[in-house]
Amino acid sequence: MASKDDAGTSNVVTRFAPSPTGYLHLGGARTALFNWLFARHYGGKALLRIEDTDKKRSTQDAIDKILEGLDWLGLDYDDTPLFQSERGSRHVEVAEKLLEYGYAYRCYATQEELEQMRAAQRAAKQPQRYDGRWRHRDASEAPAGSPFVVRLKTAEDGETTIEDKVQGRVTVRNEELDDYILLRADGSPTYMLAVVVDDHDMGVTHVIRGDDHLNNAFRQLPIYHAMDTIEGGWPEPVYAHVPLIHGQDGAKLSKRHGAVGVEAYRDEMGVLPEALFNYLLRLGWGHGDQEEFTREQAIELFTLEGVGKSASRFDTKKLLNLNGHHIREADNARLAALVAAKIGPAADEALLTQAMEVLKVRAKDINELAEGAAFLFSKRPLEMTEKAEKLLDGEGRERLAKVSEALSAENDWTIEALEATTKALAERLELGLGKLAQPMRAALTGTTTSPGIFDVLVLLGREESLARIDAQATPAEEGANG
């Protein structure tokens, strides 16, 4: 049976189909990204389906977080999201057609019978799967009014082969596939049926998902084949099963590796969306040795041929290094707004924007930017770190008094003028510039790390800079008014 048009043609349709039972985790975000990029690369459609049939576990909060996370990453979707729970009647319609044409059957086996079957299989060390006991029996053999499920009639011999765009050719013996349930005893459709019907009705041409779904593909294909025989127009999609993301220890990424939702990388870790976009792109896909990609480059270059067969390892350090690069490339006003949100009401966005060029040089995340900018809004007396306190010994305070005197006489409060004045003072005192700059930094910021000391002086302004220096240059017993 022919599959839909292969990669490289027009009319590509992909879908991202999360279950709203939790946050949008990294694996899901990467699947969404790969589907979106593939569709955009070929000028096709990227669709979104919310698989919310598990009403006990699906929540509106999870749906909101998924949509918010996708929007934050810049993954826009064509058409409105499709909610699987609203399509139950369509799923049942297909199951009934499969029943009508002999591709499915009613199974009246009781739970007790199925438990006995599994126990016997365990005892015989056989694979545990349904044994087809109602496949060739007539419904009249069941007691009147007995509950039943509807099962798919899968091939009993031969093989099924999938030409997967990532895994290559994969073949299974049909005897390994059981007659799985399409409709439960309460008449509700199962995931396996709903996925196929929805993919068909949405016109999905390429199913790109984690390789933990590879076995599902072999179970889903018979529905395509049967429905194509019954009514035509049910070509199977092209499959691409992407290896999962692992932690640094090689195990599947999980909460113990720090795996959290996309919103945590934004809100708690201070990662920019373009950095996570770039990092997820490189988790399992490559284009030569290139590490950094703009959104436009990613769309232009992304193909399934670039997806590797082996699992990729998530590395927080690499993500933050990449994030640092994107911070340095980012617009200062945008960064200032993000930092202001971290600092709170005391923040001055205009001052932060002015400071951002020097603040962002070393920062790897928005949290570090906020920490680096905190000195701008500190109230006197400044709280000192232990290392800063050590620089403000008697000798350091004496030098600050001389710095204050020299800077007070400087009318041109610019980086160049302040640097010249301070260097002249250091030469006069026969000191290296660092011997003055270190206690100055401690007095001005309360820390031993900051942007260049002359940048700090300009950002704080003349009045505040001299007030902070004087507060530390004055002996403690006289400094209560500082």
From Swiss-Prot:
Coiled-coil annotated spans: none
Motif ('KMSKS' region): 252-256
One cellular component term from this protein's GO annotations in UniProt: cytosol
Record keywords: Aminoacyl-tRNA synthetase, ATP-binding, Cytoplasm, Ligase, Nucleotide-binding, Protein biosynthesis
Superkingdom field: Bacteria
Disulfide bond sites: none
Localization per record: Cytoplasm
Pfam families from the UniProt entry: Anticodon_2 (PF19269), tRNA-synt_1c (PF00749)
Alphabetized GO MF terms: ATP binding; glutamate-tRNA ligase activity; tRNA binding; zinc ion binding
EC number: 6.1.1.17
Role of this protein: Catalyzes the attachment of glutamate to tRNA(Glu) in a two-step reaction: glutamate is first activated by ATP to form Glu-AMP and then transferred to the acceptor end of tRNA(Glu).
Family statement: Belongs to the class-I aminoacyl-tRNA synthetase family. Glutamate--tRNA ligase type 1 subfamily.
Assembly and binders: Monomer.
Name of the featured protein: Glutamate--tRNA ligase 1
Species name: Erythrobacter litoralis (strain HTCC2594)
